[in-house]
């Protein structure tokens, strides 16, 4: 009987999203234990000061869970551009754990509401989903925070693909590019996105929320890419 249980525990129940090797019973969350340990996690510190143009940055805290390394780039690429929407449920717990760690020393500043970074209509129709909104929906039960879908809209004239823009262009492209659809007076809002790079999109979204009365806006992203890193090359 013990031999059978040991054999059963080694049966594959899926594959690791990083190395593609079969997972055994007892390994869960989409990653094998070695790959989970090797994920390039970031320290629980604010990234706003690392913004390329800090004088233009808007928002209170910017937090991310993972550094933009090849394995993370591959995961985000599959999630964002190759229809792997199921990755939201795999990746959200990593972000949730990091967020809880980040606020451990500042519990009084815990946000009131989750909001997703919007994408253009053309991007939505091409992908069939907004990856940031999928992450936010998964974070909702993990962090016990309400989620307001559709609160932010991207204005049509600003629908340029930001992931292919140079860092300096992103700030110009994103200026006044977001619209908050209702008042959020006095609320502290957590803005959820997949990748933080220059901070241009985050700042534009934060400005839109602050114009409608938000008390403060924090940015929560799955990954952080240095502005000089060639993100498109990873795709």
Q: Whereabouts are the PLM-identified features?
A:
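Glycine-rich phosphate/pyrophosphate-handling loop used in enzymes and phosphotransfer proteins
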Residues: 1-192, 197-235
């Amino acid at each position: 009987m013990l031999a059978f249980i040991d054999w059963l525990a080694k049966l594959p129940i899926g594959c690791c999203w990083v190395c593609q090797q079969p997972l055994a019973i007892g390994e869960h969350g989409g990653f094998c234990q070695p790959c989970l340990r090797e994920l390039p996690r970031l320290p629980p510190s604010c990234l706003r000061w690392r913004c390329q143009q800090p004088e233009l940055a808007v928002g209170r805290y910017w937090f991310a869970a993972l550094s933009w390394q090849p394995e993370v780039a591959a995961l985000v690429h599959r999630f964002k551009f190759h229809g792997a929407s199921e990755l939201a449920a795999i990746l959200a717990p990593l972000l949730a754990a990091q967020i809880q760690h980040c606020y451990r020393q500042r519990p009084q500043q815990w946000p009131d509401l989750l909001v997703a970074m919007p994408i253009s209509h053309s991007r939505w129709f091409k992908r069939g989903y907004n990856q940031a909104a999928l992450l936010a929906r998964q974070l909702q039960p993990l962090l016990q925070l309400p989620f307001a879908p559709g609160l932010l809209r991207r204005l049509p004239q600003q629908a340029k693909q930001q992931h292919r823009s140079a860092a300096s262009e992103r700030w110009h492209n994103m200026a006044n590019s977001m619209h908050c659809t209702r008042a959020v007076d006095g609320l502290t809002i957590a803005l959820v996105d997949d990748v933080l790079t220059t901070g241009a999109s985050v700042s534009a979204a934060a400005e839109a929320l602050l114009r409608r009365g938000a008390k403060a806006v924090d940015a929560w992203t799955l990954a952080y890419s240095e502005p000089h890193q060639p993100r498109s090359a990873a795709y």
